[in-house]
């Protein structure tokens, strides 16, 4: 079974090896057919401190690292994204 991957933006850097990544998902409303953007936040393990606020990153699902962390940073895609558009 392949691990799940998501692309999102780093919106917070609260602890030493943890970052919060916001991932946007576009879904169509069943009744009104309007496209809705849903945002989900993931706590992601950043062991080597490669992420900064606003970086666009790819995250991969792994076995549980702690109570709430089940994702790690796979790669940093770009560092020019504005984190304000994802909200906090």
From Swiss-Prot:
Q: Does the keyword Transferase apply?
A: no
Q: PROSITE patterns attached here?
A: RIBOSOMAL_S17 (PS00056)
Q: Which UniProt keywords apply?
A: Cyanelle, Plastid, Ribonucleoprotein, Ribosomal protein, RNA-binding, rRNA-binding
Q: Which Gene Ontology molecular-function terms are recorded?
A: rRNA binding; structural constituent of ribosome
Q: Give a GO biological-process term.
A: translation
Q: Which domain of life is it from?
A: Eukaryota
Q: According to its UniProt record, where is this protein located?
A: Plastid, Cyanelle
Q: Name one GO cellular component term.
A: cyanelle
Q: Name a Pfam family for this protein.
A: Ribosomal_S17
Quaternary structure?
A: Part of the 30S ribosomal subunit.
Query: Family, per the entry?
Result: Belongs to the universal ribosomal protein uS17 family.
Stored HAMAP family: Ribosomal_uS17_B (MF_01345_B)
What is the documented function of this protein?
One of the primary rRNA binding proteins, it binds specifically to the 5'-end of 16S ribosomal RNA.
| UniProt protein name | Small ribosomal subunit protein uS17c
| Organism (species) | Cyanophora paradoxa
Gene behind the chain: rps17
